[in-house]
Amino acid sequence: MKRLIIISLVIVTIFTFVGCGTESNSSSKTSTTVTTTADSVKSNKYYNDIDSAIQTIVKAYKTKSFNERAAMYPDYFIKGEYGGNAGLKEAIKGFYTCDTEYKINSIKDMTDKYAKKCIKEIKGYYDVDVNIEKVVLANVSYKYTNYSDKRLDDSELVPTDEYYICIDGKWYYGWGLEINSEVSEQVVE
């Protein structure tokens, strides 16, 4: 009887230690995988897709008439104090903030959570293929105060600092949709 009890205890002890060892290994592997995936997403997929989609919209917007712009983004051309352009302004501005309570100065400042949210908005609301043509903006740094008297095309809106966006330490006029004449000529297709 004593032998049976001792053998049972030995078997239970062995299974307990083996079980814990397996759990521990599995847990650490999962943790490593999650970290690797997060790093990969942050440095590649979402950030590049967001940038590509934004620049695609920038190019399309700059080459279309006001009515064509409205047709491209009907959900965001709303009636309001400043007309359709104000609606599109809010739409594009959303790419950079993704949440009115979470302000960012650069696409690179986004966490994975907000990057994923932006990608969802791009695909869902704009129906934009995030892997198509990309516009490279001129690598020029300037402050919004230089353009306080400039007006948007097809609009009576007089821009203020609210309508300028800082991307990677550089200021772009008009939410990236409208660059001043000197800089816009440097946009590369």
Predicted feature descriptions by range:
Residues 1-4:
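Positively charged n-region of N-terminal signal peptides that target proteins for export
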Residues 16-19:
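C-terminal motif of bacterial Sec signal peptides marking the signal peptidase cleavage site
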Residues 57, 68-69:
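Hydrophobic pocket/interface hotspot
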Residues 151, 155-189:
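Short beta-strand edge/turn micro-motifs at domain boundaries
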